[in-house]
Amino acid sequence: MRQAIVTLKKGEGRLLKSGGAWIFDNEIDSIMGEFENGDIVIVHDFDGYGMGRGFINMNSKIRIRMMTRKQDQEIDHAFLEMRVRDAWEYRKKTVDTSSCRVIFGEADFLPGLVIDKFSDVLVVESLALGIDRMKEEIVDILKAVLSEDGITIRGVYERSDAKVRQNEDMERVKGFIGEEFDTKVEIVENGVRYMVDVKDGQKTGFFLDQKYNRLAIQRLCKDAEVLDCFTHTGSFALNAGIAGAKRVTGVDASELGIEQARENARLNGLEDRVEFVCADVFDLLPKLEEEGKQYDVVILDPPAFTKSRKTIKNATKGYREINMRGMKLVKPGGYLATCSCSHFMDYELFTKTIHQAAQNVHKRIRQVEYRTQAPDHPILWSAEESYYLKFYVFQIVDEK
């Protein structure tokens, strides 16, 4: 079947020409030929120069997501297998693959698709109409590729229930792909055991992007008193505990998260040294300050305070406040680990916000290290949306 041809306006497609994968609604001059939303189309520059192929959705502001820059490349089974194999080979070289993100959307040149592997379970998240049509074929390819390395997948669960699907005029979907199975799976990361609930946990069930950041805080936590804020299912707290922390307190507002965190503590035999409190962090930290509590290590891993540029001002206030509160609770010479998972809170703004927080509470901070997301969430420099996690470790220093 002949594919429709989309021609860009003169001077448009700047993101595309710099290596990006998105074409927005206001960049298109004309469309020649018939198509349905989700179809693969051919993209031309204003002068007829071939830019590649991608899938189109007229209901989305992101009109086209590019699949290839090669004008004559067919988007078929062989193409998808090539993409999946490339993604898996990259993970085998860069991360512990027992649990990892196998497909990371645009950064793996499969725009809109996320696939996480938790031991022998796959979790799929589809965020774009075109890739949604291909997801089951891609899953079958991935299972076959994994089997070549002796890995058998016992089940696949879909977590395409994010609100962002509504931007593509797609329903939110959650459920089994294929046969039903027990959706709780045990994984081991950095020597810590977790029970992951892929059905009812946040996002795909567990935040794999912080894998090596969790490992990085272990060396700071031996014999330390640690406060882990926004603990979710206890991952940073448990890394502190397994590293030999004297006492760890994990805080989160989610009762389900705290329940799972306590289960994970029991799983690791850490319930005597790692406790979890269900509370709003913004309410609890001022109370701890009033009580004169201080810790050797404070960890701040908040959810994204903003998911759009429109709310960045309020989000900045939130990040500033939480870092001010956190710094006040660190003993002199102690450590603050702080991060932001919002793409819109970029590196420069996050750094500036922490600096302002330190000035506001009259704290001198010494940078220990700066980190980003784990390599299984690769940052593609031509796709700025792939760079979202910023992670700092600081020492709170007093001049003696």
PLM regions and their residue ranges:
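Non-catalytic accessory regions of SAM-dependent methyltransferases
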Residues: 1-119
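Non-catalytic substrate-recognition/targeting regions of SAM-dependent transferases
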Residues: 105-116, 135-207
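Conserved class I S-adenosyl-L-methionine
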Residues: 223-232
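Conserved SAM-binding loop of SAM-dependent methyltransferases across substrates and taxa
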Residues: 233-246
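Conserved SAM-binding motif I beta-strand of class I
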Residues: 247-252
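S-adenosyl-L-methionine
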Residues: 256-299
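S-adenosylmethionine
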Residues: 281-359, 371
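C-terminal catalytic and target-recognition region of SAM-dependent MTase-like enzymes
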Residues: 335-400
